């Protein structure tokens, strides 16, 4: 059935929950719905049905930035849950674009999430930042949502522009949330001013509602004194696996290949990833904190801090040696 038909069918059956239904019928095209009740009165039920079934649906456009491990997994989930999500919320969610660092696959009519990556490889085009932004600004939807599952500073720097043009942002990218407090407040204020959402629960805890829980406690009048936990699943996995029989950099490479690290594993090994999570959580807990107030000790040898990821792996002997001794 079309999305609009699914919406209305779902709302119809939801309104009938708990009612003394004797008989139901639905036409093959899903447009006609009939329910016979054993008892009345039905005036308020019919009024509720009309209000629910015939209210206008909002169309929400989604633009996914990043098609790596998180992005590809999100596409799988969205393909599986799209119709259910739309029926439950009454919104029509349209995957309007998939964007990586060089190319874009865009369609106002919507992309098939289950085949988006295959289409991307064949049909995505190189697009500069300005033309992409103009395309987004001209969108035909009731709302446009930017899904940032990258680790891109360039994209994080665009959040102010996204807010000013009325886009919502859902972010797994930690860089904006852990930026200096001046920039952080600017971003928050920009989204509040335009009445748009900047949601970043996915930045800490692998998608568990940790940020929400912390914020709810603060809003309830609690004072949070400390938060404890394992703040790096990557480092936890590495040190659990490491027994000296395999060079440490080989384990790092395995974790990187399996998608267990940040796109640049040096962000994990240097402590930057943990620092960003701590800053985000501390701010959610009501503390005014700067990133440089978090003390970190890096495992990355000085001569490997710059250069490419390949350079890091090719010159990791010093890291192997220091971990062998520790």
Walk through the language-model features, giving the residues of each.
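Rossmann-fold NAD(P)-binding glycine/threonine-rich loop
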Residues: 152-164, 174-200, 206, 211-214
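Rossmann-like NAD(P)H-binding beta-loop-alpha module
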Residues: 192-195, 199-258, 272, 280
